Amino acid sequence: MALYEHVLLARQDISQQQVDALVEQFKGVLEANGGKFGKVENWGLRPLTYRIKKNRKAYYTLVNIDAPAAAVAEMERQMRINEDVLSFLTVRVEEHEEGQSAMLTRRDDRRERDGDDRPRRREGGFDRGDRGDRGPRRPRDNEAGEGA
């Protein structure tokens, strides 16, 4: 049997429990056709890069699959029929990754930060004094600063 990674995008207006039920439904379809589900990672509700079926957000779920191609094709057919599934992608891999995926690792790294990702800036207005290549400022000839 071949190894696959499958990412499922579910509508934003359903609950996480309904997403879990969807995954269980597709797990049943896959197992009925001789396949096995591996690791299941819920990435949560995330914004989409572009609208899909009038949705701006979706629940992302990653699933590792060990199944024959016919079982994966049947699962994908069922997903096309289901109105709660916005999109999906199945990729054949040589081996499944151990541990968390890169998406979950990135999310954990963000939680470890102090919440302020912006770089520190010096106090002051527009002139921060970081233009050492300029010489001293020329004095103005008149008070209003008009003309040259």
From Swiss-Prot:
This is Small ribosomal subunit protein bS6. It holds the Pfam family Ribosomal_S6. One of its GO terms (biological process) is translation. The keyword Ribosomal protein applies. It comes from Brucella melitensis biotype 1 (strain ATCC 23456 / CCUG 17765 / NCTC 10094 / 16M). Keywords: Ribonucleoprotein, Ribosomal protein, RNA-binding, rRNA-binding. Belongs to the bacterial ribosomal protein bS6 family. Binds together with bS18 to 16S ribosomal RNA. Transmembrane segments: none annotated. NCBIfam families: S6 (TIGR00166). Residues 96-148 are annotated as: Disordered. One of its GO terms (molecular function) is small ribosomal subunit rRNA binding. SUPFAM superfamilies: Ribosomal protein S6. GO terms for cellular component: cytosolic small ribosomal subunit.
